[in-house]
Amino acid sequence: FMFFGCSSFNSDVTFTNTSNVLSMGAMFRTATVFNKPLNFDTSSVTDMSNMLRSTAFDQDISGFNISSLTTASAMFLYNTAFSTTNYDLLLVGWEGQTHNNSVNFHAGTAQYSSGAPATARAGLISDSWTITDGGQV
């Protein structure tokens, strides 16, 4: 809940050590103008639910280590800014990592492209992920 409700927050966020953080749930929820790169160590994070809900966030987070992730429900709910380009990168990047099965992931209205992104999305779904998004472009 670190920046939850900070509607005008759009500053660089650099944390020296997030390696022990378990939950980033609702971290930027309703920080409506937030759109800065995130370079967090997410290797221990299990919860990203509501993390970027209702934000203007459109950055590449395909490099987030999701090996411990168990829920990302409503992660991008009400976020209409997340671009196809960054969603494609996320799908391909996350599917290519070691990840848990049965993760609930909400990508808001983001849409994905055919080819590698569609294949990556199908791969996550075959690992029992529930993915809610805006569908294929």
Which role fits each region the language model picked out?
Residues 1-137:
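Negatively charged
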